[in-house]
Amino acid sequence: MRVADFHFDLPEALIARHPLPERRASRLLALDGPTGTLAHRQFADLLDYLRPGDLMVFNNTRVIPARLFGQKESGGKLEVLVERVLDQHRVLAHIRASKAPKPGTRILVEGGGSAEMLQRHDALFELAFAEPVLPLLERVGHMPLPPYIDRPDDAADRERYQTVYAQRAGAVAAPTAGLHFDEALLEAIRAKGVDTAFVTLHVGAGTFQPVRVERIEDHVMHREWLEVGQDVVDAVSVCRARGGRVVAVGTTSVRSLESAARDGELKPFSGDTDIFIYPGRPFHVVDALVTNFHLPESTLLMLVSAFAGYPETMAAYAAAVAQGYRFFSYGDAMFITRNPAPRGPED
């Protein structure tokens, strides 16, 4: 299967670089997987697509202000993007500098604070901060906006590049489908008789890495930490017993649930995942999906194509471009029901 099959032309003007004034003000493109039918709606209309007895599964990861600016003690400027917090003081991070720091190099953080580079792990650097790292990041860190939002972060991003239900700090990118939900909408969802459950997947910077191979099967997926608790397993079981649907909010929730059900049965799981879902891969848990519009040739577009069918997905994206939908993290959303017989690009 070719990566190029997942290319589409996207005008620069359709890349959302700022959030809308209200979270639920986004548009919603509904795709019925079994028929391929499209409906152009507003995100607040999501309620019309939910049924009493459904279960919505959210990712409650919290984005940390993971980008730091500073310099080596010798004077060279650098930029640090924390990828994973290892403990109270140590992190794995990407470092952008004219010359990579060597073990023992002391880094002075802009705004106050310091770290020592301990060792290198392939593309990542292990750093030890002199003070607890999470409070330091909250104090002087910058929100790690994606590369396609080509502007400096501002105060509004601290609130808007974060879901209202974020709890567990550790992500360096937002689970963006969740950005559309405000407290009033969550209350309305529960009032309709829809249950909610929460998984955690700490989204890594690898989510923005381009696929650099020609054949999808040759791609090596990045690893991310996730946790699916017994409470989620029980909630899915109750939902199934009453005939409800499991509605995943975001591809990270999909990857969490399907990682915990790789053998076909959903079980509690805590650890790293490198699950890569593309056309031809089965879904064991998820029946419907809320998701944003993804980058051309990205692994997330491949996941959506596996869920809805390749022809249906690419047709929906073409319609979204033609109708001027806003794309990517701060953009509009889709509601998709699973295609029971999805076709790939080669079918």
Swiss-Prot record:
Any single GO BP term: queuosine biosynthetic process
Pfam name, any one: Queuosine_synth
Organism domain of life: Bacteria
Subunit comment: Monomer.
Catalytic activity: 7-aminomethyl-7-carbaguanosine(34) in tRNA + S-adenosyl-L-methionine = epoxyqueuosine(34) in tRNA + adenine + L-methionine + 2 H(+)
Full protein name: S-adenosylmethionine:tRNA ribosyltransferase-isomerase
Annotated pathway: tRNA modification; tRNA-queuosine biosynthesis
Gene3D superfamilies: QueA-like
Family note: Belongs to the QueA family.
Cellular compartment(s): Cytoplasm
GO molecular function terms noted in the UniProt entry: S-adenosylmethionine:tRNA ribosyltransferase-isomerase activity
Organism: Pseudomonas aeruginosa (strain ATCC 15692 / DSM 22644 / CIP 104116 / JCM 14847 / LMG 12228 / 1C / PRS 101 / PAO1)
Gene Ontology CC annotations of this record: cytoplasm
Entry EC number(s): 2.4.99.17
UniProtKB keywords: Cytoplasm, Queuosine biosynthesis, S-adenosyl-L-methionine, Transferase
SUPFAM superfamilies assigned to the protein according to its UniProt record, in alphabetical order: QueA-like
Cited function: Transfers and isomerizes the ribose moiety from AdoMet to the 7-aminomethyl group of 7-deazaguanine (preQ1-tRNA) to give epoxyqueuosine (oQ-tRNA).
